[in-house]
């Protein structure tokens, strides 16, 4: 189909300001459309660096970009801060959490993923997840505050504050484990002279046989070796069965006393109520090669929340940033073609895998590009360069580069700030 039905002056509502939603809004910034970008947060969050917020490497503002700042010079793109709770397709409206509606001519759903605890309520209530900037800050606060609590804890309680369990051996879990390991080695002993950090255990649990299980065998082996060289305890073929806030129970019967469990073991599509069950598979909207929902001619889904079958990917695309960004670019091109009444065929989306990468620590990284596989220092520099280039503003690029350079030269960071502690709730400084 050559024309998607977009007309000049149409109201296009994009729900979600992640990689896909933001990319589409920027693609349409000069189009003759009325574009409304809606998100629960007032800022775009650069998720690949959440772990550096959690480990005190970067300040939150360096990876957070206010939407109104991004589009302050645009006359066609506006922003609304709202949590969308329902889609009313027959009325062409979406409902917000405070019972207000937003009308649309065309709806693009780019709501990304949420943490998947696989229905385990106990884990969802007691584990930390890391899907927002605020959750990353919460992890930083809790981990740093644990050492303050350890000082006042009874002897039999101390080890629980010194064990961190990270569940999930994908890039997030591996990178977070490595970041905490560097803190353990280079930073924390200088801050806490009366704590024996040889008892500080970083325990990474992965359900499959390997860390970075979606990468090559060489990267799997290298990532585990890097982690174990940094004194991370790696437990593969290990599943967290239960966690009550005090003790983690593993599927091998092991019981680990811990006050800190971070869940990085899975995500699921963040769908919105209102569409039929037939429109969804595994919490992702079923779309055609143009990212359009099959039962609608004016509703689209992008990125992690879109399920598109292609000959190369019969089970849908991986839920990674590259897919989200390029689906948004492709849809943007097709929308612009439609506005010009271009009679040529709309462009089907085709995913081109650009590779995977993960960093474990200083000079310890693995990079897999379509034409080469790398590890060690050169991979680490490539990882830093590529992530730095993805940061939106020049100012933030400079801030992040300065922080990385300072950390590289001094093996230290000045961002170990604990905020928003409720002393009554925590019952922290008790000498009883």
Tell where the protein language model's regions lie, with residue ranges.
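A Rossmann-like FAD-binding core segment of flavoenzymes
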Residues: 75-87, 181-289, 295
């Amino acid at each position: 189909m050559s024309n998607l039905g977009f007309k000049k002056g149409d109201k296009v509502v994009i729900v979600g300001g992640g990689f896909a939603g933001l990319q589409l809004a920027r693609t349409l910034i000069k189009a003759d459309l009325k574009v409304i970008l809606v998100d629960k947060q007032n800022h775009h969050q650069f998720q690949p660096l959440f772990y550096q917020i959690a480990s005190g490497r970067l300040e939150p503002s360096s990876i957070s970009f206010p939407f109104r700042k991004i589009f302050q010079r645009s006359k066609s793109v506006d922003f609304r801060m709202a949590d969308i709770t329902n889609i009313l397709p027959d009325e062409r409206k979406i409902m917000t959490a405070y019972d207000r509606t937003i009308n649309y001519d065309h709806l693009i759903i780019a709501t990304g993923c949420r943490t998947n605890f696989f229905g385990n309520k106990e884990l969802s209530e007691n584990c930390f997840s890391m899907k927002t900037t605020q959750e990353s800050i919460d992890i930083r606060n809790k981990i740093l505050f644990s050492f303050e609590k350890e000082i006042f804890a009874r002897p039999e309680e101390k080890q629980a504050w010194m064990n961190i369990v990270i569940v999930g051996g994908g890039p997030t879990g591996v990178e977070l484990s490595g970041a905490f390991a560097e803190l353990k080695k280079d930073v924390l002993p200088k801050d806490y002279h009366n704590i024996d950090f040889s008892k500080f255990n970083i325990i990474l649990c992965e359900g499959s046989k390997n860390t970075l299980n979606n990468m090559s065998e060489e990267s799997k082996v290298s990532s585990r070796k890097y982690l174990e060289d940094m004194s991370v305890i790696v437990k593969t073929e290990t599943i967290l069965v239960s966690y009550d806030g005090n003790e983690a129970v593993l599927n091998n019967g092991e019981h680990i006393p811990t006050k800190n469990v971070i869940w990085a073991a899975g995500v699921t599509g963040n769908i919105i109520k209102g569409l039929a069950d037939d429109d969804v598979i595994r919490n992702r909207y079923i779309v055609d090669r143009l990212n359009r929902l099959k039962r609608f001619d004016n509703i689209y889904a992008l990125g992690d929340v879109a399920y598109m079958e292609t000959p190369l990917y019969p089970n849908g695309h991986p839920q990674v940033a590259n897919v989200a960004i390029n689906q948004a670019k492709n849809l943007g091109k097709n929308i612009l073609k439609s506005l010009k009444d271009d009679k040529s065929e709309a462009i089907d989306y085709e995913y081109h895998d650009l590779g995977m990468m993960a960093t474990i620590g200083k000079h310890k990284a693995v990079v897999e590009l379509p034409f080469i596989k790398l590890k060690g220092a050169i991979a680490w520099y490539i990882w830093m360069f590529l992530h730095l280039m993805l940061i939106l503003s020049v100012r933030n690029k400079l801030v992040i580069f300065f922080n990385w350079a300072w950390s590289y030269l001094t093996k230290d960071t000045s961002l170990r700030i604990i905020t928003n502690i409720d002393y009554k709730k925590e019952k922290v400084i008790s000498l009883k």
